[in-house]
């Protein structure tokens, strides 16, 4: 609203200063009278006269002369003058906001450049309206609006002058890594990477490396001698011929491990352990003693014998079997003898001799008074 009031005020001042201000006002009034007096049918009529060339006003009083000649007629030059006045005023009103908007844009540019000059380190001061400014900044900001750094300037310079990198490499100068610091040269100890590799060079010299990689024959012999002195299986038990696969145990003689042949002093335990010829673990002699014979697997009655823990063919006699149970609140222990050659049953019962060599009565069952069951074996025992 203030802007419109300002424009209307300026229009009134211009009309006062202009010599033909009253004529333009009268032209507007005449144009409005013509529009209001026209009939509705004339609206859809020929309006080609709107596109005619606008002629300059012939002079003051032209509209009055046309009106005096004919009361109901409106001259064409007056309407053209009215249109020209309206267009000039409209153009003048539209040009003023454009000028103000242009001035506002210039102020924003000045503020932006002033802010860039305070934040950027390489900002170039530019003057507005000097005529030589093309509108392109020498150092334009990046996408985020911040000024470019020195590293980006160097990258742009290297892209503009590709021959400079070749000159640096020819002169032996280290090439800097883009976006970082240059890698130091390691000298003789490490390979010169010149920025082409991020792996650090070795810190030791080539002479020490050669000694470690290619040892001398004397050093190899010293290492071998030292390794031979060390025990191969330290902290573990020595292997015996019985546990090592593919080896045979020494032949067993008729003397047991505790005894010694005649004419030789008895050996001690330390000799068995520390001796290099004999194994560390003594092997038990499994050979049956002289004067005993084994029982055949198929006796005369046809029942095969399965030797095991319950049967020992080297011992003849009886074995004592017990049964413990409770009767009338008392614990009863009954025992009896069975031949050694018989099998041990889960259910206690009296068994007969299988080998026909076991004695009928032994010192264990000689004092038995009563048998658990009167079987033929018990009757035979007590009968005898």
Swiss-Prot record:
Keywords: Host cytoplasm, Host-virus interaction, Inhibition of host innate immune response by virus, Inhibition of host IRF3 by virus, Inhibition of host MDA5 by virus, Inhibition of host RLR pathway by virus, Interferon antiviral system evasion, Metal-binding, Phosphoprotein, Viral immunoevasion, Zinc
Gene Ontology CC, one term: host cell cytoplasm
Pfam families: zf-Paramyx-P
Entries under InterPro entries matching the protein: Paramyx_V_Zn-bd
Intracellular or extracellular location(s): Host cytoplasm
Binding positions for Zn(2+) 1 per the UniProt entry: 318, 337, 362, 365
Region (Disordered): 1-23, 38-317
Entry's Gene Ontology molecular function annotations: metal ion binding
Residues binding Zn(2+) 2, per UniProt: 341, 353, 355, 358
Record keyword Nucleotide-binding present: no
Biased composition (Polar residues): 50-59, 191-206
Single Gene Ontology BP annotation: symbiont-mediated suppression of host cytoplasmic pattern recognition receptor signaling pathway via inhibition of MDA-5 activity
Phosphoserine: residues bearing it: 68, 125, 192, 249, 257, 260
Composition bias type Basic and acidic residues, residue spans: 7-20, 83-101, 150-168
Role, per record: Plays an essential role in the inhibition of host immune response. Prevents the establishment of cellular antiviral state by blocking interferon-alpha/beta (IFN-alpha/beta) production and signaling pathway. Interacts with host IFIH1/MDA5 and DHX58/LGP2 to inhibit the transduction pathway involved in the activation of IFN-beta promoter, thus protecting the virus against cell antiviral state. Also interacts with and inhibits host IRF3. Blocks the type I interferon signaling pathway by disrupting the RIG-I signaling pathway.
Miscellaneous comment: The P/V/C gene has two overlapping open reading frames. One encodes the P/V/W proteins and the other the C/Y proteins.
Family of this protein: Belongs to the paramyxoviruses V protein family.
Comment block on domains: The C-terminal zinc-binding domain is involved in binding to IFIH1/MDA5. This domain is also involved in viral pathogenesis.
Subunit structure, as described in the record: Interacts with host IFIH1/MDA5 and DHX58/LGP2. Interacts with host IRF3. Interacts with host RIGI regulatory protein (via CARDs domain) and host TRIM25 (via SPRY domain); these interactions prevent TRIM25-mediated ubiquitination of RIG-I and disrupts downstream RIG-I signaling.
Name listed for the protein in its UniProt record: Protein V
Annotated source species: Sendai virus (strain Fushimi)
